[in-house]
């Protein structure tokens, strides 16, 4: 089994565990934890750090609150990872807002505008 394959499998397992932990979260929060999505996880080579990219259904302020919620409860989530995945040491979790969806929408809008401009140029010529 190659190291890259193992890393990908661990990232996938961590994502599953965190999603389950979000679903079972019982604490107080300003946001609805069931609307938080774990989009992707990037595990460091030494498996000591996990960058977790989070998305939330809501406006920008609510998205920031979702990341803050995850940061405030990182001990709960790290414990869930430690209990469910056999690792020598559970990775330190670092939560980030995922901007992939917004970026792809912005790029598609720009491409549509370019296409319209090219069509207008062709019509004018």
Curated annotation (Swiss-Prot):
- Give UniProt keywords alphabetically: Cytoplasm, Ribosome biogenesis
Q: Which PROSITE patterns match?
A: RBFA (PS01319)
A Pfam family cross-referenced in the UniProt record is RBFA
SUPFAM superfamilies from the entry? Ribosome-binding factor A, RbfA
Q: What is its main location?
A: cytoplasm
Q: Which GO terms describe its biological process?
A: maturation of SSU-rRNA
Q: Native species of this protein?
A: Kosmotoga olearia (strain ATCC BAA-1733 / DSM 21960 / TBF 19.5.1)
Name of the gene: rbfA
Matching InterPro entries, A to Z? KH_dom-like_a/b (IPR015946), RbfA (IPR000238), RbfA_dom_sf (IPR023799), Ribosome-bd_factorA_CS (IPR020053)
Tell me the protein's name.
Ribosome-binding factor A
Say what the protein does. One of several proteins that assist in the late maturation steps of the functional core of the 30S ribosomal subunit. Associates with free 30S ribosomal subunits (but not with 30S subunits that are part of 70S ribosomes or polysomes). Required for efficient processing of 16S rRNA. May interact with the 5'-terminal helix region of 16S rRNA.
- One MF term in the entry's GO annotations: ribosomal small subunit binding
| Subunit field text | Monomer. Binds 30S ribosomal subunits, but not 50S ribosomal subunits or 70S ribosomes.
> Superkingdom of the source?
Bacteria
Gene Ontology CC terms? cytosol
Family membership = Belongs to the RbfA family.
Tell where it localizes. Answer: Cytoplasm
């Amino acid at each position: 089994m190659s190291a890259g394959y193992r890393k990908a499998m661990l990232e996938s397992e961590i994502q599953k565990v965190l999603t389950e932990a979000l679903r079972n979260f019982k604490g107080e929060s300003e946001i609805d934890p069931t609307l938080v999505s774990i989009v992707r996880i990037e595990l460091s080579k030494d498996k000591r750090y996990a960058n977790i990219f989070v998305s939330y259904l809501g406006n920008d302020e609510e998205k920031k609150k979702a990341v803050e919620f995850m940061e405030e409860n990182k001990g709960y989530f790290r414990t869930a990872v430690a209990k469910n995945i056999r690792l020598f040491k559970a990775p330190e979790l670092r939560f980030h807002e995922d901007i992939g969806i917004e970026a792809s929408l912005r790029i598609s809008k720009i491409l549509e505008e370019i296409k319209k401009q090219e069509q207008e140029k062709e019509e004018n010529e």
